[in-house]
C-alpha cells in the first residue's frame, strides 16, 4: 500500500533504495507496533468481503498481508484493471 506508493515516487525522483528504506523505517516500525494487537486478534481468522465500494481489493490485501487473515472471498462491483492489477497481484503470495 503506502510503502509501494512511496517507493514508486522515490524511484521516479531517483532516490536510492538504502536512503528510502532508512527514511521510512520509523514510520514502518510505528505502524507495525500499532497493528500488533490487531494481528493477535485477526491472524488466522477468515474474511469474506461483499461487493460495495471498490475498496474491497485494497482492504483484502491489507487484511491478508498485514493482519494475517485468510481471504475466503473478495467481491467487488467493478474492477478497473489499470488501478487494481498491482493490488490483485499482492493478494496472491
Say what each PLM segment does.
Residues 1-93:
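An N-terminal assembly and electron-transfer interface module characteristic of large anaerobic redox
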